[in-house]
């Protein structure tokens, strides 16, 4: 519904001041990242964007647990930090061990979330089998947070839902090759050929038994190399306020995805999506759905022409915001490939 969006990235160094220091002693922006982020040649086309939106809607719609754990921005940040900090651990360096205290120190110092919320989220991840605590063999007094196969599988599937459409993109050979290479590193069967992975069954949640597999060495290596970029990655997402503001609330990002998906499917900017339908698919109350739509209107993403979601206009700014958001996310995901 709109032209391809150019890659956007803030001036190097500006995010560190805004987001705080997560990775002490590390320069998060390496040469490879700068080349990709500042080349200004990467674009996201409407077909790629629509395919990503469809993938995410198929994956998360109706899957209340996974949507809450991975789409709400604060939980997403903790999820990502756990994976990267775990992959970057050095058994010989106790300061690198992923303990609850270290996770709290890294994230709470940035101002992105509080220590109490981090502890609560860790308990939730543990309750649903995404992480477990193990005593360090070198010091039984210390408990290490360990991402389980369930968490690694959810991360691999989430990444695949974003990147698989890029593998089929014509005229973007370098980007397509990078996406295919990364998916191959995450895949156990090496089937990253741009087609849907066998685990990407929308009827099987990412945390179900069908999709659980231990992380590949390539997956861990990618997360390890991504760790120095994580601070700026979070900062980039914070700069996209029209989307991140919705993503900070339960069901907000999924609601936006469903609106864009419906508009793309119908080929019209004027759609109907009742608050009861949003409530059912996103696992939120109808009152919360109404408040999300009112917030989306305040942010300039939609215009409400009738009550109850009977006439919603998806504005061009919503497509532009999603294009810019996905472009920035793609740049970071591929920065270390």
Q: Which residues fall in each region the model found?
A:
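A short, conserved structural fragment
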Residues: 126-136, 297-307
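Long, charge-rich, low-complexity alpha-helical segments
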Residues: 312-313
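Active-site/pore-lining binding-face segments in mid-to-C-terminal subdomains
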Residues: 276-283, 293-294, 300-304
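Residue-level "edge-of-site" marker
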Residues: 138, 292, 309
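Intrinsic disorder/low-complexity detector
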Residues: 1-114, 127, 137, 145, ...
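Short amphipathic alpha-helical interaction segments
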Residues: 112-127, 283-297
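Conserved catalytic core of two-component sensor histidine kinases, primarily the HATPase_c ATP-binding
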Residues: 142
């Amino acid at each position: 519904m709109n032209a391809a969006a150019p890659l956007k990235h803030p001036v190097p160094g500006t995010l560190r001041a805004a987001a705080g220091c997560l990775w002490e002693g590390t320069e998060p922006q390496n040469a490879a990242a700068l080349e990709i982020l500042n080349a200004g040649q990467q674009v996201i086309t409407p077909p790629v964007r629509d395919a990503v939106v469809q993938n995410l809607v198929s994956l998360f719609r109706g899957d209340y647990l996974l949507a809450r754990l991975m789409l709400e921005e604060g939980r997403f940040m903790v999820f990502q930090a756990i994976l990267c900090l775990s992959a970057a651990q050095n058994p010989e360096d106790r300061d690198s061990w992923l303990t609850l205290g270290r996770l709290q120190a890294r994230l709470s110092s940035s101002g992105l979330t509080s220590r109490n919320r981090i502890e609560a989220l860790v308990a939730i991840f543990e309750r649903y089998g995404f992480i477990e605590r193990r005593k360090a063999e070198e010091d039984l007094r210390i408990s290490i947070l360990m991402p389980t196969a369930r968490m690694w599988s959810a991360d691999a599937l989430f990444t695949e839902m974003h990147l698989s459409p890029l593998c089929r993109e014509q005229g973007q050979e370098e980007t397509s090759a990078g996406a295919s290479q990364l998916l191959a590193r995450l895949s156990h069967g090496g089937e990253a050929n741009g087609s849907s992975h066998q685990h990407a069954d929308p009827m099987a949640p990412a945390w179900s038994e069908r999709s659980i597999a231990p992380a590949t060495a390539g997956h861990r290596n990618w997360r390890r190399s991504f760790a120095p970029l994580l601070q700026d990655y979070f900062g980039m997402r914070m700069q996209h306020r029209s989307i991140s503001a919705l993503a900070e609330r339960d069901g907000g990002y999924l609601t936006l995805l469903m609106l864009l998906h419906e508009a793309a499917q119908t080929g019209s900017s004027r759609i109907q999506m009742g608050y009861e339908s949003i409530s059912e698919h996103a696992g939120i109350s109808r009152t919360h759905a109404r408040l999300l739509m009112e917030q989306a209107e305040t942010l300039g993403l939609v215009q409400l022409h009738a009550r109850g979601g009977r006439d919603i206009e998806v504005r061009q700014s919503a497509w532009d915001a999603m294009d810019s958001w996905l472009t920035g996310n793609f740049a970071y995901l591929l920065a270390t490939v």
